[in-house]
Amino acid sequence: MPSFDIVSKVDMQEVDNAVNQAVKEIGQRYDFKGSKSEVTLEKDAIKILADDDFRLKAIVDILQSKFIKRGISPKALQYGKAETASGGMVRQIITVQQGISKEKGKEVVAVIKDTKLKVQGQIQDDQVRVTGKNRDDLQEAIRTLKGKDLGIELQFVNFRD
């Protein structure tokens, strides 16, 4: 029985490269001269520390442009609230999403059921497995999911006949 898996994974090496490029650009930009702003990557979270809201927004813009250049979807990032830190600084934490949460998995399965195709979706940990009788239905399910905006970046892997 043909099947495929739907996953939401981000290459952490590319995230590291994008953060390093952003740090380099921040160090070279004129509007950040004398600033104590910093960007650090900790496991699956990016911590931004900036002097004020203006610089925080500028750093987030730099990070987004670097992520897009490195082929990482902006949907893979979850932005925390900007909060004040010690010394009058502003802090924001950006989480890199790995895997599909249970709620998003339920949304994906609901979208698949709404297509009225002869395919079934089942949630397995941080991925969704879709099985069906024929390959064309599975490809139609992929097309439908690509057309929907579920708020996360989806990849389709392990297509088996």
Curated annotation (Swiss-Prot):
Secreted recorded as keyword: no
Described function: Nucleotide-binding protein.
Record Pfam families: DUF520
The name this protein goes by in its record: Nucleotide-binding protein Gmet_3206
Domain of life assignment: Bacteria
Annotated keywords: Nucleotide-binding
A GO MF term: nucleotide binding
Gene Ontology cellular-component annotations: cytosol
Protein family membership: Belongs to the YajQ family.
Keyword Phosphoprotein assigned: no
